[in-house]
Amino acid sequence: PVLIVYLLSITAWQNIWMSISILVLIFLPLISFFLIKKLDFDTREQVDPTDSEIKEIKQWKRIEVIKDYRFYIVCLNMLAMPWIATGVFVYQSFITEAKEWGSFVIAQSFMVYSILSVLTLLGSGFLIDKFTSRKLLIFMNIPLLISTLVLFYFNSPITSFIFLGLIGISNGLANVLGSSSWAEIYGVKFIGSIKALTTALMVFSTAFGTALFGLLIDKGFSIEQIAMVSFVYILISLILLFFVRNKLNPQYI
């Protein structure tokens, strides 16, 4: 973001997009070719095919998942990050003007968002291996919840870094838990169709977030009021998840 803001000060935005397109066309195929050239698909795990526990784990089909109430509670939490973060990104100029942060502050804050997202991604893998995704789910949106309070109560430019940093932490957790949680709860045999469903819901939620933010802004809502709407949604989804947190274990046949 900081680089783009700097480039906008010295050249037209059309030139920036054209340069990005050329770089992607040239370097992405080359990088992809060299990275997958010696890709090994063999697993390092030693699995005993006669292990009774592995054979007894229920592998849920998508039609069964749709009928499971736990799916919708987990989805409420999984979809919080996409619709709220997309709303923030699309309407960042509205937030900047409302908080009087200045155009460069929000761009600099995205660096904090990116750094914390990457660090959380790296750390969350270790935590999942140690504690499982099911136990970490309840913590995923807590940083996002706090970020809405930061946006509601504070106006100082420094809070922009805290606000987007907290969103970055939730984003890092959501990116990893969004795949591993479904596999832990519903098994891996039909994970493709389950992930297709959840990905479709995620895409819908990003469009929903953009539309909802725009509608609320048109209705005269302040950014603080929008933050409180987001806070209430996250809080309700967390409370529901809290009550089913001990029922997310895989089922055995």
Residue spans of the language-model regions?
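Helix-loop-helix hairpin linking two adjacent transmembrane segments in secondary transporters
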Residues: P1-D40
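A membrane-interface helix-boundary motif in multi-pass transporters
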Residues: Y6-I22, L215-Y233
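Flexible cytoplasmic inter-helical loops of multi-pass small-molecule transporters
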Residues: I36-W60, Y252-I253
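Extracytoplasmic gate region of multi-pass secondary transporters
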Residues: I63-S124
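Helix-to-loop junctions at the C-terminal end of transmembrane segments
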Residues: T120-T132, I217-D218
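Structural signature of the two symmetry-related core transmembrane helices
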Residues: K135-L149
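Intracellular juxtamembrane helix-capping segments at the cytosolic ends
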Residues: L173-Y186
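A late C-terminal transmembrane helix in Major Facilitator Superfamily
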Residues: I185-G220
